[in-house]
Amino acid sequence: MAELPKYVLEPLRRGDRFYVRSKRLAKLRLLFLLLLGSCIFAPPMHSQIAQEETLGGPDSHETGQGPHGHLFGEWAGERSRLLERGVKFDFQYVSDSLWNIKSDKKERFASWNRFRWTVDVDFGELVGQRDLFFHATALWQGGGNLGAYLGLLTSPSGMSSMNTTRLDSWWLEKRWLDEKITARIGQFAGQDFYGAQHYAASFIFEPMGYALGNLFTDFESFDPPSTPAMEVRVVPLHNFYVKSMVEAEDRDPFAHNPTGLVPQFRGGPVSISEIGFTPGKKATTLRAFDTVESRKGYSGLYQFGASYNPGKFTTASGVSQSGDYLLYWMASQAIWRVDPKGAKGLDATFAYDWNPPDINRNNTMLTAGLRFNEPLPLPIHNTMSLGYVQNRLSQQFVPPGAPRWKPEHAIEFNALLDPLPMLLLQPVIQYYANVGAKTGRALVFGFRTKVEF
């Protein structure tokens, strides 16, 4: 049985069923890594691609920071001088402060806090090695997990997981032919780029504020405990892309690599692929998460993806078998604009995923949402978003004599406000029905705070 991780539902210890890689597979993987590495450092072709956003979900930047976008300022101009050389530093704090103001459990305040340090390097600007980039990010995070306390399938926070201080991800990225071909190798999470919600920064609860919540079932990696990975992306047509990655499976990543500094190969290779259609935008310019600048005009993103893990899994009947997979469909579209070339207006998003109900208890999820960009007549950036999540458990895993599971429903409304260039506030209210696929309701209120240092 494949379930969500221990910090979402319950402890998941299956060391005795880890998929064991053969020596032949290990040699092939090492050979592929060496070949890809040699391609990354091949002589560059000319391009003038600027640095762009490399963080996603709650850590992404809705707007550019600009000259007054940091609490500590420009370091006497040193930040700008480094950026001119292709080196960008980012230090931020994000917190979700949430209360269950009504539920079957006693009222509780839970605050999840995260400090993140990030460096991005454009070697074209730094040493003349064009189209070669480096990214690394580390964090400290900790606090209370309200979703685990309430027994929810849908986590109220897109950040909460485990208390940790660690290197999250790093990679080297090489681009050819004006980004028509891109290769990346390093340590990064599948859920940062596959099954990730394009409008994630506009929502708080996890399935819409980061990535689809049951991508964990076949052990697609997530941040911050990213695993070794490699990816290739190809853009054969103006509005169409194909990308695929292979990552190392790890069924208990926080325990096996607590610092993130020692690459771990604890299971088989998990493969993830996606095709995408990008009406209104060049596929080469599109990233996993949108920004205020990228949402201008009637742009959209339509995705179909699949992940496959060849490891050992246990079915609902207790039989061990090899292989598990997940399919997902996602759509994000600007449906109305005040100015056809502007960002003010209404966006819609929809996503659905499925994997075999005889292997996966958390086997299907549906999300849908609306976002109104700049609804308030204010000089600051603001949005209002309404989201819905339906979480279903496979009836094949209902314990004998227990009642059938019900679909858990979650609704969220939030407003995002940018009162200062370095400060973001996002008050939110959430309602949950059939908590934990059983009975019961919960009402959660709180806010997200983000500070750029």
What role is predicted for each listed range?
Residues 441-453:
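Outer-membrane beta-barrel "beta-signal"
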Residues 117, 170, 183, 230, ...:
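Membrane-embedded beta-strands of outer-membrane beta-barrel proteins
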Residues 146-171, 178-271, 396:
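Surface-exposed coil loops of outer-membrane beta-barrel proteins
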Residues 255-261, 274-278, 305-321, 325, ...:
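Outer membrane beta-barrel transmembrane domains
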Residues 43-96, 100, 106, 127:
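N-terminal periplasmic/intermembrane-space "pro-region" immediately following the signal or transit peptide
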Residues 89-97, 134-140, 183-187, 242-248, ...:
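Transmembrane beta-barrel strands of outer-membrane/channel proteins
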Residues 73-89, 122-134, 177-180, 239, ...:
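Short loop/turn motifs that connect adjacent beta-strands in outer-membrane beta-barrel proteins
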